[in-house]
């Protein structure tokens, strides 16, 4: 089939390369978000998908208004039979959805109808789900609600960060998307409606929502930290200093100190403990402003934290 591939971040690259390499499909163009400011200088940089497409000689479309009449006409001139989507990052209007005769097929990183929205992997980890996966479905105007073509499942490991899990789903999801498009091209695949029950939402996580709430119990804090690693990144105030946090330790072999109030900090020779709504939690790595990730105990000794300082 003649395909237009729509995607933006690195997560979309396995699917893009798989479709370009497929003998059954012809990726005639890539649709991605406009160049965005990056780095300290704020210089506009192409998206990872744009860079990969250009390296492979695929034309790149970067409309600032993808639902405009002008872009709908531009896409229509390309005459794609189907459009494949992986984390494009913009809502698609009715006119755009009506361009390809086989519609728009989206790869979503959850087992729909669970975790519809922009942050399904993060939501699954934060909720403590044991299993998640990826789903291919036909895009319709409402959010992630279209009929399903296929799914692949993935176990969530106890130490998975969102980055770890998304990396695996990007690879297995690429296989699923390719197989889905093969089935559509052959006329052998029919989408089925999503169940009405089991719908949960996974909106984008803001920086403020990634702030650790120490009054919560340890299992919830630990999952939430993994869920926002690497982006937007867990953080807390230690005194008046904003510090990013890496995944924390849940090691039964290390005896925690006595009870600590939520946010209270205790530093010993090898560990930094913070009080929570349950037992104290041992920090792993921290990233003070302007520095790289480092061992929490090493940082605490160097910073000479006042015994009265708290995390908040």
Swiss-Prot record:
UniProt name for this protein: Methionyl-tRNA formyltransferase
Keyword hit for Protease: no
Binding site for (6S)-5,6,7,8-tetrahydrofolate: 110-113
Entry-linked HAMAP family: Formyl_trans (MF_00182)
Function: Attaches a formyl group to the free amino group of methionyl-tRNA(fMet). The formyl group appears to play a dual role in the initiator identity of N-formylmethionyl-tRNA by promoting its recognition by IF2 and preventing the misappropriation of this tRNA by the elongation apparatus.
Species whose genome carries this gene: Mycobacterium ulcerans (strain Agy99)
Gene Ontology CC terms, in alphabetical order: cytosol
UniProt keyword Oxidoreductase present: no
Family annotation (Pfam families): Formyl_trans_C, Formyl_trans_N
Keywords for the protein's UniProt record, in alphabetical order: Protein biosynthesis, Transferase
EC code: 2.1.2.9
């Amino acid at each position: 089939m003649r395909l237009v591939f729509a995607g933006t971040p690195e997560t979309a690259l396995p699917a893009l390369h798989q479709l370009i390499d497929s003998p059954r499909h012809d990726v005639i163009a890539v649709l991605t978000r406009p160049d965005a400011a990056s780095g300290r200088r704020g210089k506009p940089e192409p998206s990872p998908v744009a860079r990969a497409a250009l390296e492979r000689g695929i034309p790149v479309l970067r409309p600032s208004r993808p639902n405009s009449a002008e872009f709908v006409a531009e896409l229509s001139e390309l005459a794609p039979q189907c459009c494949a989507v992986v984390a494009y990052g913009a809502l698609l209007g009715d006119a755009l959805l009506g361009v390809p005769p086989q519609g728009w097929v989206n790869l979503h990183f959850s087992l729909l109808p669970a975790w519809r929205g922009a942050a399904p992997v993060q939501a699954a980890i934060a909720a403590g789900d044991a299993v998640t996966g990826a789903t291919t479905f036909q895009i319709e105007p409402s959010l992630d609600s279209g009929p399903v073509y296929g799914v692949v499942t993935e176990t969530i490991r106890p130490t998975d960060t969102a980055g770890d899990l998304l990396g695996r789903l990007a690879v297995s999801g690429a296989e699923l998307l390719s197989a889905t498009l093969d089935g559509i091209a052959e006329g052998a695949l029919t989408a089925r409606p999503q169940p009405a029950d089991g719908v949960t939402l996974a909106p984008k996580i803001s920086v403020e929502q990634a702030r650790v709430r120490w009054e919560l119990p340890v299992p919830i804090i630990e999952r939430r930290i993994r869920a926002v690693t690497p982006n937007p990144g867990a953080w807390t105030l230690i005194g008046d200093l904003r510090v990013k946090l890496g995944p924390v330790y849940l090691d039964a072999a290390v005896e925690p100190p006595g009870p600590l109030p939520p946010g209270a900090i205790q530093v010993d020779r090898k560990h930094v403990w913070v009080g929570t709504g349950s037992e104290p939690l041992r920090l792993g790595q921290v990233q003070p402003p302007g520095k790289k990730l480092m061992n929490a105990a090493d940082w605490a000794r160097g910073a000479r934290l006042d015994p009265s300082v708290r995390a908040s």
